[in-house]
Amino acid sequence: GTEDVLAKYESAQEKNRESRTQLHLLKKEVLSKEAASILSEIIENNESNSLFSISRHYSLFSLDDLSTLAREIGPHIQKVAFLVHDPSHTVFLVSNGRIDCGKLVKENASIYNGKGGGNATLARAIFAKDEYVTTFIDLIEKHLR
């Protein structure tokens, strides 16, 4: 009867909660490993005195996940790191603030019909097409040389 349906519903809700918790913990772990990977790449580049900027592409993380990742690595980025969310053609520009990411987006995204904004340490630019993302990143990298 009704109690049976209610019990099944509560059981499904509990399984849902457990799955969401597990997903959250997995994402947190994977984001932490990705941050460590980016930071070790930064250390290698600093040791080789490379002027190279880091650019990584993602399709499984959400925009919120990339924002979290950006905040974690930001203080360690001397130049600019580009975190690209491929499904939405969104580029996060991340830095320690020495290079103003918000200003770079405001001054350059519109060249490729992009929109966006942000502050000195974190900004995002959203484009209509994937090729605009690549061209935008190339432009910013040349601008920073």
PLM region descriptions:
Residues 1-145:
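Terminal appendage regions of diverse proteins
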